Amino acid sequence: MASKKSGGSAKNGRDSFSKRLGVKRYDGQVVKAGNILVRQRGTKIYPGKNVGLGNDYTLFALIDGKVKFETSKGKKVVSVYPLDA
């Protein structure tokens, strides 16, 4: 009688490395220009005042200042406001 060892275990058991997405600088934190604020897939959070949007939808600070998360027209927005000196 023909026999074959059961296969299939090699077809499972893979996983990808986590992409370390999410908010990197929180509301009220002081940031420098160029600091990454949010890493995301798609625009879950939109850029506001003094915030740039990268090719991979990364949000980053354009000026030195304080981070502020807001909602505008039902969308989450992150802005950076200059520190009052």
UniProtKB/Swiss-Prot annotation:
SUPFAM superfamilies: Ribosomal L27 protein-like. Signal peptide: none annotated. GO terms for biological process: translation. It comes from the Bacteria. One of its GO terms (cellular component) is cytosolic large ribosomal subunit. InterPro entries: Ribosomal_bL27, Ribosomal_bL27_CS. Keywords: Ribonucleoprotein, Ribosomal protein. Pfam families: Ribosomal_L27. GO terms for molecular function: structural constituent of ribosome. Coiled coil: none annotated. Belongs to the bacterial ribosomal protein bL27 family. This is Large ribosomal subunit protein bL27. It comes from Persephonella marina (strain DSM 14350 / EX-H1).
